[in-house]
Design a protein with these regions (language model features):
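Structural signal for membrane-spanning alpha-helices in multi-pass inner-membrane proteins
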Residues: 1-5, 33-41, 110, 114, ...
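Juxtamembrane helix-loop-helix connectors linking adjacent transmembrane helices
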Residues: 5-77, 94-95, 165-174
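Hydrophobic alpha-helical transmembrane segments
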Residues: 22-27, 71, 100-105, 121-126, ...
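Membrane-interface helix/loop boundary segments of multi-pass membrane proteins
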Residues: 48-59, 81-105, 133-139
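Active-site alpha-helix of zinc metalloproteases
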Residues: 73, 77-78, 86-87, 143-144
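Alpha-helical transmembrane segments of multipass membrane proteins
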Residues: 74-75, 79, 92, 107-112, ...
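Histidine-centered divalent metal-coordination motifs
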Residues: 86, 114, 148, 152
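Functionally important transmembrane alpha-helices
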Residues: 119-174
């Protein structure tokens, strides 16, 4: 909140209810989910540390949570992170340094805040850019909030409820 004040950016300045923007946000989660499923099942050595983190931390913390709690935490993450990274950081910086530099900087900051592994930080930076562009194009914070929340929920629910450990994780433990 202090950062929003310092940057002269209202927390919820570009957030308004619009069914069309909600649907755009929901549909915009599909490319991110395709990337998630591909990465989850790809045999890439750079993802081995991420697999280990997911198994030892994410699964340990969230495995016993009922599906409704996963939905709530995903919605909260979508709202809080998008308000912070898009509205406060990207929007606030755009007033001072311009739209494109603010998008780039906010995306890098988003990646750094998701620094689980170097690979995931890079992926998160690209996701941050995608969400930032979505906000610029749609002009309503609701779209990236919906994208983020749907992505988090589907990815978390799938990983915890339907995902079998990838072969590369099995090789690590052997």
């Amino acid at each position: 909140m202090m950062l929003a004040f310092f940057l002269g950016q209202p927390l919820f300045g570009d957030l308004r209810w619009c069914l069309r923007d909600l649907w755009v946000g929901i549909l915009a989660s599909l490319p991110l989910l395709a990337l998630f499923f591909w990465l989850l099942h790809a045999s890439l050595p750079a993802l081995e540390r991420l697999d280990e983190f997911l198994e030892t931390h994410v699964r340990t913390i969230f495995e016993a949570w009922p599906i409704w709690q996963l939905a709530v935490i995903s919605l909260l993450a979508g709202v809080c992170e998008e308000v912070f990274f898009r509205s406060v950081i990207q929007g606030g910086l755009a007033r001072h340094i311009g739209t494109i530099p603010a998008l780039a900087l906010a995306s890098v900051i988003f990646g750094v805040f998701h620094l689980v592994t170097k690979t995931y930080a890079l992926i998160a930076t690209l996701i941050g850019a995608y969400l930032g562009i979505l906000w610029i194009v749609i002009g309503n914070l609701l779209a990236p909030i919906a994208t983020h929340a749907v992505y988090d929920f589907v990815a978390l629910a799938y990983f915890l409820r339907a995902h079998v450990r990838p072969r590369r994780m099995t090789r690590i433990k052997e």
